From Swiss-Prot:
Belongs to the glycosyl hydrolase 29 family. It comes from Branchiostoma floridae (Florida lancelet). GO terms for cellular component: extracellular region; lysosome. PROSITE patterns: ALPHA_L_FUCOSIDASE. GO terms for biological process: fucose metabolic process; glycoside catabolic process. This is Alpha-L-fucosidase. Glycans are attached at residues 156, 224, 362, 375.
Length: 449
């Protein structure tokens, strides 16, 4: 026992400590779980879920610089004169919010991590923050700790890593507006609200993803980002497992932080040198729930599997967003997409989880084919079934030990080498309901170069 304690102490002594500089912070290795996970679920939920119209930027579009007339017209048609955005908060009731049910749906999606909005740009906190009096989910609205309840449900009933989105700025916070007017020479908002809430969140809920946003107006020095990250990596309760993104100040995107997001819906289509994430949303027009959305506004399963394949092939993670309702429901169309992704991953997860990019990301001869690799296997994710029943791949080079199979299909597949480079694979002869999945099919090749 004494020896184990000594070894533990010695290990702690030799853990690197990171200085509050980008040169130092950028040297921190990304915890391995994140790259292995590949797929996560984003959830945008807040007071904006009450009007659930336009997007989660409803308040800004109504009262901010955008001043969109369609929002004004919506308010005139549906709410009395003098109605304020703050009046939506008591309507954020979450009476149907069942964290155990959410955890089950999220687990069924095949995702390996979830990122919940703790606070969006409106400033309403989904936990009882002592720095957001009467503008939080315990003092107002649901009168529940929405963050804490989901954190517990996820950890006790799933194998997902729990993460939190946090907006550094608030559109209309007087301290923030004063600092902005002072051209960031004062930091009253950062000290009294932004940093205080971040430390509170990490210490209370131990998120393994800290997904920062709302940083773009001010430099990282205003946000004290490097000091916070040094604490997060050195001394926080999640210092060994936490991952962060690149939204820590103006000009930081795609340059500094943990993994890169670069922009919303970032999907470069080519291999990147740095670990990255494609954060995108099933509703093509909004991150929050919209009551006016039509079926055509939602990405279908062909779209989603394609985006997953493209993203993972090029070394990224996919963070796919849904928007719960004001009363705490995951509506059927979102649930259907999540469960369908899970069914696809049950069959084809070997081509996604813990994979590495191969020497080629997509095929040179057959469009709609994306590659991943793991150990001695190369996976070709085939988005479109070939009309002829034969699939010719231009990149793989066969060898005497080459074998070809389809994930979820018991029998090996027949194949022949193509002169020069490539192989032609005979796809299974079967009806659509006999195939292992509906949307995309994975060819596993061993012994190819």
């Amino acid at each position: 026992m004494g020896l184990l304690l000594l070894l533990s102490l010695l290990s702690a002594c030799f853990q690197p400590r990171y200085a509050p500089t980008w040169d130092s912070l950028d040297q921190r290795p990304l915890p391995s779980w994140y790259d292995e996970a590949k797929f996560g679920i984003f959830m945008h939920w807040g007071v904006f879920s009450v009007p659930s119209f336009g997007s989660e930027w409803f308040w800004w579009d109504w009262k901010g610089a955008h001043d969109q007339n369609f929002i004004k017209d919506f308010m005139k048609r549906n709410y009395p004169p003098g109605f304020r955005y703050a009046d939506f908060a008591p309507m954020f009731t979450a009476e149907w919010y069942n964290p155990l049910q959410w955890a089950e749906v999220l687990q069924a999606s095949g995702a390996k991590y979830v990122v919940l909005t703790s606070k969006h740009h409106e400033g309403f906190t989904n936990w009882p923050s002592k720095y957001s009096w009467n503008w939080n989910s315990v003092d107002n609205g649901p009168h529940r700790d929405l963050v804490g309840e989901l954190a517990m449900a996820i950890r006790n009933n799933s194998d997902l890593h729990f993460g939190l989105y946090y907006s550094l700025f608030e559109w209309f916070h007087p301290l923030y507006l004063k600092d902005k007017q002072n051209k960031w020479t004062t930091q009253d908002y950062t000290k009294d609200v932004g940093l205080a809430e971040l430390y509170e969140l990490v210490n209370a809920y131990h998120p393994e993803v800290v997904w920062s946003d709302g940083d773009w107006e001010a430099p990282y020095t205003y946000w004290n980002s490097t000091n916070f990250l040094a604490w997060l990596y050195n001394d926080s309760p999640v210092k060994d497992t936490v991952v962060t993104n690149d939204r820590w100040g103006s000009g930081m995107l795609c340059h500094h932080g943990g993994y890169y997001t670069c922009s919303d819906r970032y999907n470069p289509g080519v291999l990147q040198k740095h670990k990255w994430e494609n954060c995108m949303t099933i509703d093509k027009k909004s991150w929050g729930f919209r009551r006016e959305a039509t079926l055509a506004d939602y990405l279908d399963m062909d779209d989603l599997v394609k985006i997953l394949a493209e993203t993972v092939s090029c070394g990224g993670n996919l963070l796919m967003n849904i928007g719960p309702t004001h009363d705490g429901r995951i509506v059927p169309i979102f649930e259907e997409r999540l469960r369908s992704m899970g069914k696809w991953l049950q069959v084809n997860g070997d081509a996604i989880y813990a994979t590495k990019p191969w020497r080629a990301q997509n095929d040179t001869r057959e469009s709609g084919v994306w590659y991943t690799s793991k150990n001695d296997s190369v996976y070709a994710i085939v988005l479109d079934w070939p009309n002829s029943g034969q699939l010719t791949l231009g990149v793989p080079r066969s060898s005497p030990t080459t074998t070809v199979t389809m994930l979820g299909w018991a029998a090996p597949l027949k194949w022949v080498a193509v002169s020069g480079s490539g192989i032609t694979v005979q796809m299974p002869t079967a009806s659509s309901n006999q195939l292992p999945c509906q949307w995309a099919w994975v060819i596993r090749m061993k012994g190819v170069m």
